[in-house]
């Protein structure tokens, strides 16, 4: 009686693993090696001329604004967090800056923490940076007080 339940759970786990693996592979295969290196903050001293264009995203799965923001970002964190860096960490777009209030900031902070919380496999360092980004924007003149 317990055996069919165990088998069912095993099959379900395998199916979900395969599905997430295929989704990850779909995104991964659209990125060039230099783009992957750039996203992982790996510096390549002298990329060959044929690969210079590979630093730009070729994926249609990522919207244009995010492509531009990631292509301009040099990687790493500044010693003291700046407002542009905080906006990038919390994924606040240029359109949302005009409407940035406490409610939107809380929503973006929560979304980032859900994705990167240490209890769910995220990095404690990134969680600290997300909290720091929220604090920077709370003190910022960009935040509209109601």
UniProtKB/Swiss-Prot annotation:
The keyword Protein transport applies. CDD domains: DnaJ. The keyword Protein transport applies. InterPro entries: DnaJ_domain, J_dom_sf. It comes from the Eukaryota. Keywords: Chaperone, Membrane, Mitochondrion, Mitochondrion inner membrane, Protein transport, Stress response, Translocation, Transport. It is found in: Mitochondrion inner membrane. GO terms for cellular component: mitochondrial inner membrane; PAM complex, Tim23 associated import motor. GO terms for biological process: protein import into mitochondrial matrix. Residues 85-146 form the J domain. Gene3D superfamilies: DnaJ domain (1.10.287.110). Its main location: mitochondrion. GO terms for molecular function: ATPase activator activity. Present with 573 molecules/cell in log phase SD medium. Plays a role in mitochondrial biogenesis and protein folding. Participates in the translocation of transit peptide-containing proteins from the inner membrane into the mitochondrial matrix in an ATP-dependent manner, probably by stimulating activity of mtHSP70 (SSC1). Interacts with PAM16/TIM16 and is recruited by the PAM complex. This is Mitochondrial DnaJ homolog 2. It comes from Saccharomyces cerevisiae (strain ATCC 204508 / S288c) (Baker's yeast).
């Amino acid at each position: 009686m317990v055996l069919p339940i165990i088998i069912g759970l095993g099959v379900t786990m395998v199916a979900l693993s395969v599905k997430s693996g295929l989704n990850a592979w779909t995104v991964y295969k659209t990125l060039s090696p230099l783009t992957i290196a750039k996203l992982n903050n790996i510096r390549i001293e002298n990329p060959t001329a044929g690969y210079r264009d590979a630093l730009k995203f070729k994926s249609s799965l990522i919207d244009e604004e995010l492509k531009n923001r990631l292509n301009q970002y040099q990687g790493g964190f500044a010693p003291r967090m700046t407002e542009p860096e905080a906006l990038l960490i919390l994924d606040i777009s240029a359109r949302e800056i005009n409407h940035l209030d406490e409610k939107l900031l809380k929503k973006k902070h929560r979304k980032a923490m859900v994705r990167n919380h240490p209890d769910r496999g995220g990095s404690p360092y990134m969680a600290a940076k997300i909290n720091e980004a929220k604090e920077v924007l709370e003190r910022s003149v960009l935040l509209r007080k109601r």
